[in-house]
Amino acid sequence: MANVVENLGKLERRVTISLPKDAVQKEVDSRIRQLAKNVRMPGFRPGKVPLKMVTQQYAGQVEAEVLSDKVGKQFFDISRAENLRVAGQPSFAPKADAVEGDYAFDATFEVYPEVKLGDVATAEIERTKTTISDAEIDRTLDILRKQRVHYHARGEAGEHGDGGADTAAKDGDRVTVDFVGKIDGEAFQGGTADDFAFVLGEGRMLPEFEKAALGLKVGESKEFDLAFPEDYHGKEVAGKTAQFAITMKKIEWPHLPEIDAEFAKSLGIEDGDLTKMRNEIRDNLEREAKRRTQAVVKNQVMDALLKISELDVPKALIEQDQQRLVEMARQDLVQRGVPNAKDAPIPAEMFAEQAERRVKLGLVLAELVKANELQAKPEQIRAEVDEFAKSYEDPKEVVRWYYSNQQRLAEMEAYVVESNVVDFVLSKAKVTDKEVSFEELASATAQA
């Protein structure tokens, strides 16, 4: 009997699965006889329970298992016979109008879509390029110096000076204060502190608070009003105005280390050579720039491929990917130590758009790779593993680590395939180069 595949929509299909009841019952009886050999019931030795009692106890459960197995196998056989590329899992529902003597089920499912790849030559890609300048190295050195800042009491003489004659607090100073805040004369949680330290100008405190501390000298006090923003994280004070009194207890000025041999040694340059230090910084920035520009270009290529391709996306695959993203989000919460993260409700709907893009992109890439033979070659995978291993102390051990685990190797293979796709698209598309500074590149990729 020919299988009839009903077309319910662009991707949705339905087939009817029929199973003779006598064949099902025969399998049920066989499984119950096997079960009876080991089943335990009060008052009977193992394997000595009467078959009738075993049947009464387990017939329903065994029948459900047999039906599930046989329906699944027949669906698989039909899918193979009809060359159906099933996307996701089918849903089975019993039919009320089954032929007498048969069980009948409707299997509803989706199939993989036809992917129509557009002309890659019409894609437009803006390829970001970054050249590391001396100014960028200087900016990085400034950041590194600020990370190693240490503070000295303003006005007190020391090996690095006294910070200037002016002993009033100014931007960049680390100040220590006592403060008391009240709303309508009542203290509120978090509104009072002693020996509270912060750096003026860093933006850690609300602007009115920093403004009040600026210009104060040790021992001086000031009263001021502070309006909490409507979106302030402390809901009990958000949108309200508090009256604060602040007393300056300590003012420390920042001393940045000089760029000298000792500074270079602190960055891992053993002989303290400043030229080596700058070259090392340049190399690091160039590696980081390459990584970031590759990410930007890759995203542009993927966007371009989605734009020129036509396909319908199976809902089943989107739902599966939503669940994967939910689990990834949950694992992230667990790793960050969020309380009750394992049981936290994470609605799958919040990942709907992301999941659809991921699934659509996966289908497009699979078609492009197949059509243009862009699969990863073993030598490409090895070259990438070797390149990655170079940055470690024992590259050979890193290579062994990769090749000892198929999942890790599969991840590298996927990376190589993506690189092949990017190179292929760039060789065909309309590409324009855009020079940006490292700072602009870092800002753009941080927001992505």
Swiss-Prot record:
It comes from the Bacteria. It is found in: Cytoplasm. GO terms for molecular function: peptidyl-prolyl cis-trans isomerase activity; protein folding chaperone; ribosome binding. Keywords: Cell cycle, Cell division, Chaperone, Cytoplasm, Isomerase, Rotamase. Residues 172-257 form the PPIase FKBP-type domain. Its EC number is 5.2.1.8. Pfam families: FKBP_C, Trigger_C, Trigger_N. InterPro entries: PPIase_dom_sf (IPR046357), PPIase_FKBP_dom (IPR001179), Trig_fac (IPR005215), Trigger_fac_C (IPR008880), Trigger_fac_C_sf (IPR037041), Trigger_fac_ribosome-bd_bac (IPR008881), Trigger_fac_ribosome-bd_sf (IPR036611), Trigger_fact/SurA_dom_sf (IPR027304). It catalyses: [protein]-peptidylproline (omega=180) = [protein]-peptidylproline (omega=0). One of its GO terms (cellular component) is cytoplasm. One of its GO terms (biological process) is protein transport. Its main location: cytoplasm. Consists of 3 domains; the N-terminus binds the ribosome, the middle domain has PPIase activity, while the C-terminus has intrinsic chaperone activity on its own. Belongs to the FKBP-type PPIase family. Tig subfamily. Involved in protein export. Acts as a chaperone by maintaining the newly synthesized protein in an open conformation. Functions as a peptidyl-prolyl cis-trans isomerase. PANTHER family: TRIGGER FACTOR CHAPERONE AND PEPTIDYL-PROLYL CIS/TRANS ISOMERASE, TRIGGER FACTOR-LIKE PROTEIN TIG, CHLOROPLASTIC. This is Trigger factor.
